[in-house]
Amino acid sequence: MQVFVPYPSPIDVARAMSNDKLRLRKQILECDQILKAISGESKAWKNHPIVKMFLKHSSWLLFYRDCLQYFQEGDIAWAQDRSDYADELYRPPFLTDDFCDQHKRRLYTKSPTLYPQFASYGTSEENWYMVDGQIVKYINGKRI
């Protein structure tokens, strides 16, 4: 499971992914699964590092999901109208330049034709999660 955050702003992420309809749908679904695990509505994924990563940041994740949803539906104005809210929203501390750059590499690796703007970041097979203040790296579902 992966939530891509190539930018700290959910609006900027939605804008970057707006041409990748399949990825948008998948991200929305994965956000829903994470939010259900956080709320206790679902036991699935409750021990996954991404659930632990967003445990204290569910409001940010919900806004991220909503931005993707509205961009997918073509209602770009929804997110733009809430840009002030996005700026005030508590940003998870793990959304550093290095962390976001790694997500740019992952998106480019997955689909270079849809993410040519990330070509200069190179490629990577690693998924990064922040757990207990530490970056945890995985490749193909295995911690490295």
Whereabouts are the PLM-identified features?
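Expand to "…catalyze enediolate/carbanion chemistry for C-C bond making/breaking, isomerization
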Residues: 1-144
